[in-house]
Structures are given as structure tokens and as C-alpha cells.
Amino acid sequence: MNIRNAQPDDLMNMQHCNLLCLPENYQMKYYLYHGLSWPQLSYIAEDEDGKIVGYVLAKMEEEPDDVPHGHITSLAVKRSHRRLGLAQKLMDQASRAMIENFNAKYVSLHVRKSNRPALHLYSNTLNFQISEVEPKYYADGEDAYAMKRDLSQMADELRRQMDLKKGGYVVLGSRENQETQGSTLSDSEEACQQKNPATEESGSDSKEPKESVESTNVQDSSESSDSTS
């Protein structure tokens, strides 16, 4: 399974995945809008045959008086590839890209009040908090929870990893002990290794604004089903 940045020629297959998984669907111009405006923020999951089995469509909110923050427009994983943690990986990758490219402080999304599996994913796995209820947010009149995830902890972790890389180390995990003694790494503490220059790599549910509401009623999750809007 591979997670990678979405390319323009992925958009048709992302739309197809959306149609299979979610009741909130978008015209192709909406995918193009995201892809052209924020090409760094949307990701796809593909299987061993290169077929798209999940995606996250994301953007930055354009509110000049607010702190920089991102928004998850849509997240879906095909039924055949659920319970593999793909939704969490897609969400984390999009959030990291928001921090690295736009210095985002938090990320937001909307989810149907009735979508218990997605709420479980966002609240229990990804640490989103409900910020408010938006009445009749969806085209069928259902209310949405507006949710936010603070990105300061992830930003600190990314800075730490960058500092380690600058010092000549590659981080092998997300919460490793940063201390080494001499050139020896003990089994219980360090999860960093000296870089090898030869092998180092470079590098929601919706209406259309009130044409379009986003769909984050995820159809996947490490636990059950994920989706967002």
C-alpha cells in the first residue's frame, strides 16, 4: 500500500472513489480547484496495482484575520481496504503538509452527527475536538459537528525530526529518545540511526459551496469507517 501526493491525473479516480463511498459528491471543477490551489495538501492511497483505494482532499482556509489553518474537505477509503489505518495515515500526511508548507496551527472538518464511526476516528484516534454544531449543514438537512485538531504537537515533532536530520541522524519513529551515548544505540532508548548518504531519499459530506459543503464523513478507519466533509 502506498500513500503519495495526489497528481492532476489522479482526480478522476479520486472522484470515482468519492462516488462509491460518500453521499456528498463534487463536480470535477471542485477537485481541480483544490489540486491547482493547494497541490501539496491532497493525498491518495493506492494498492499494489496502482489503483486508488482512498484519498484525502484538503485545502487552506482563506481567512486573513484568522491564524493559518487547514481544512479537510473530503476523506474516503473503499470498503475493500478499510480497517487498515489508511484514513489515519492520509489525515496525518495532509496535516503534516499543512504545517510544512503553510505553518498551519490547526486543521478543521465537518462530520455528520449520525456518523459514529467517523466521530470515533476523529475524536479517539486523531484528537479532533468538537467546536460547534452547524444546524442543517448537509443538503438533506442533517446537522454537522464542526471539529478542530490542534497541530502544535505535530509541529514540534516535525521540528525535532528536522533538527535530528541536520545533526546527521534519521528518525525511525515518532517518539524516539533523542539521546545517544557515543556511537552506540541501546535497545531501550534510541530509535535514530546515522544517515547513509548513499541511501538517503530526498526528500465531508457536502453541498456545493453553499455551492459545496465538504465531506469528511469518512468511509474507513483504523477502527471502523472513516469519512469527512
From Swiss-Prot:
The entry's keywords: Acyltransferase, Cytoplasm, Nucleus, Phosphoprotein, Transferase
Polar residues: bias regions: 179-201
Organism (species): Homo sapiens (Human)
The family this protein is said to belong to: Belongs to the acetyltransferase family. ARD1 subfamily.
CDD domains according to UniProt: NAT_SF
Domain N-acetyltransferase, chain residue ranges per copy: 1-152
UniProt-annotated location(s): Cytoplasm; Nucleus
Catalysed reaction, written as an equation: N-terminal glycyl-[protein] + acetyl-CoA = N-terminal N(alpha)-acetylglycyl-[protein] + CoA + H(+); N-terminal L-alanyl-[protein] + acetyl-CoA = N-terminal N(alpha)-acetyl-L-alanyl-[protein] + CoA + H(+); N-terminal L-seryl-[protein] + acetyl-CoA = N-terminal N(alpha)-acetyl-L-seryl-[protein] + CoA + H(+); N-terminal L-valyl-[protein] + acetyl-CoA = N-terminal N(alpha)-acetyl-L-valyl-[protein] + CoA + H(+)
Compositional bias ranges of the Low complexity kind: 214-229
Function: Displays alpha (N-terminal) acetyltransferase activity. Proposed alternative catalytic subunit of the N-terminal acetyltransferase A (NatA) complex.
Protein name, per record: N-alpha-acetyltransferase 11
GO cellular component: centrosome; ciliary basal body; cilium; cytoplasm; cytosol; Golgi apparatus; NatA complex; nucleoplasm
EC number: 2.3.1.255
GO BP annotation list: N-terminal protein amino acid acetylation
Tissue-specific expression: Present in several cell lines, with highest levels in MCF-7 cells (at protein level).
InterPro entries listed in its UniProt record: Acyl_CoA_acyltransferase, Ard1-like, GNAT_dom
Residue ranges of the region described as Disordered: 175-229
Main subcellular location: cytoplasm
PANTHER family: N-ALPHA-ACETYLTRANSFERASE 11 (PTHR23091:SF282), N-TERMINAL ACETYLTRANSFERASE (PTHR23091)
GO molecular function, one term: protein-N-terminal-glutamate acetyltransferase activity
Enzyme class name: transferase
Biased composition (Basic and acidic residues): 204-213
